[in-house]
């Protein structure tokens, strides 16, 4: 219970930081909307003006599926022989993400084509807003790591810089693969060697890859506001709160594999029905570069979460000699 509470609080802080920075810097301002998509967005602005929670829950298939999944998971707790069902679902999930991984290997070719088309049609100046978004995302995640996660580490009597040095080889693996899942076994071994109990590591790290994706949370909130700014959609306070609420749920559906954040972003926009999905084409060209920042932040965040819980549960022992 304490682990889930930690996950929810920290990822919510990540979402709020992403929204705050995007609102202040406005990376989407300056992007020419007609250069992205020529479709009619009036239906989206009409939905924004006539928003209601009843229609939101009734019309959004994504939210319905997520809600069903949550209640189905609760129901499974009371079913005998649930282990086989859970194992089957985990196996199916692995197949899906293996397929996604294969697709993402080809994504750079599509991204290259998209970038070449953008530059050829609109000029090199069209990349400036994308560079602004990338820089904003990287700076925001750095602030989150060294300020928020740094504060959490200090509260545990540890230092964030020392921890980053301790896992530097794993960080290079994550950077090279753009997947925080690639270094999962090594992270668990290092945390146990550092002094965290095996039971805490075995619980927090795997759970964190579904519930504690700090980097993905920052990216989702910033990308959502970026696209809203691109299309000139002035979001109300109620809609911003709705975005936070939806992201608090959909961000838990991402995985530590390359490209999953982009898939979750598409699901989020589908659920919101306020921002045109065509805008995702603009992000495709730079998503691979931002995926590295997401993966590294997710990776560090799960390590810090494990240390925090081990310290607070009295499950942190002297490091091995």
What label would you give each PLM region?
Residues 2-11, 65, 86-89, 133-137, ...:
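Alpha-helical transmembrane segments of multi-pass membrane proteins, especially transporters
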């Amino acid at each position: 219970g304490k682990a889930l509470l930690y996950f929810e609080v920290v990822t919510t802080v990540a979402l709020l930081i992403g929204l705050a920075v995007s609102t202040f810097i406005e990376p989407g301002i300056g992007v020419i909307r007609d250069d992205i998509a020529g479709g009619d967005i009036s239906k989206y602005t009409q939905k924004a003006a006539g928003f209601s929670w009843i229609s939101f829950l009734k019309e959004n298939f994504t939210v319905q599926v997520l809600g069903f999944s949550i209640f189905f998971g609760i129901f499974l707790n009371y079913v005998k022989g649930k282990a086989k069902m859970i194992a089957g679902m985990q196996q199916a999930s692995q197949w899906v993400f293996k397929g996604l991984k294969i697709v993402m290997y080809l994504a750079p070719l599509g991204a290259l084509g998209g970038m070449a088309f953008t530059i050829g049609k609109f000029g090199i100046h069209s990349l400036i807003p994308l560079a602004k978004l990338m820089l904003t995302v990287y700076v925001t995640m750095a602030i989150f790591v060294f300020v928020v996660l740094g504060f959490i580490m200090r509260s545990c009597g540890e230092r964030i810089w020392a921890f980053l040095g301790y896992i530097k080889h794993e960080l290079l693996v994550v950077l090279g693969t753009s997947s925080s899942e690639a270094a999962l076994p090594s992270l668990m071994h290092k945390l146990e060697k550092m002094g965290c109990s095996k039971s805490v590591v075995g619980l927090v790290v795997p759970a964190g890859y579904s519930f504690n994706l700090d980097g993905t949370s920052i990216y989702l909130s910033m990308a959502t506001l970026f696209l809203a700014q691109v299309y000139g959609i002035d979001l109300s306070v109620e809609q911003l709160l709705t975005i936070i609420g939806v992201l608090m749920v959909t961000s838990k559906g991402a995985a530590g594999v390359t490209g999953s954040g982009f898939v979750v972003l598409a699901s989020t926009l589908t659920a919101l029905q306020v921002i045109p999905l065509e805008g995702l084409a603009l992000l495709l060209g730079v998503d691979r570069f931002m995926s590295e920042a997401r993966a590294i932040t997710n990776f560090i965040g799960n390590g810090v979460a494990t240390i925090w819980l081990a310290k607070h549960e009295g499950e942190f022992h002297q490091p091995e000699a």
